Amino acid sequence: MMKGQLAGLMRQAQQMQENMKKAQDALAEIIVEGESGGGLVKVSMSCRHDVKRVAIDPSLLADDKDMLEDLVAAAFNDALRKVESTSQEKMASVTAGMPLPAGMKLPF
């Protein structure tokens, strides 16, 4: 490989790294909301998996504890699915055109 080609690859890798950092910083600011029980339980989570808020409708507090626990778990899982989906969409623009191995997920 010629010196110029290597330098070009290094610049390209550095640019990609900077773009990945910007995308990850942007994802940290995105908040998604998972819910269950028709919106009776809601979980707000950043795309860095930080839970920001859990809201439980007061009508559930007098109900069955097991049901409430199931609804909270379902809301968390819904939020996680939304985080993964949003992250994949946002990172797709950064990784577009990069020759990544099949099944490789970013960020790592």
Swiss-Prot record:
Signal peptide: none annotated. InterPro entries: YbaB-like_sf, YbaB/EbfC. It is found in: Cytoplasm, Nucleoid. SUPFAM superfamilies: YbaB-like (SSF82607). Pfam families: YbaB_DNA_bd. It comes from the Bacteria. Keywords: Cytoplasm, DNA-binding. One of its GO terms (molecular function) is DNA binding. One of its GO terms (cellular component) is cytosol. NCBIfam families: DNA_YbaB_EbfC. Binds to DNA and alters its conformation. May be involved in regulation of gene expression, nucleoid organization and DNA protection. Belongs to the YbaB/EbfC family. Homodimer. This is Nucleoid-associated protein Bpet3552. The lineage of its organism: Bacteria, Pseudomonadati, Pseudomonadota, Betaproteobacteria, Burkholderiales.
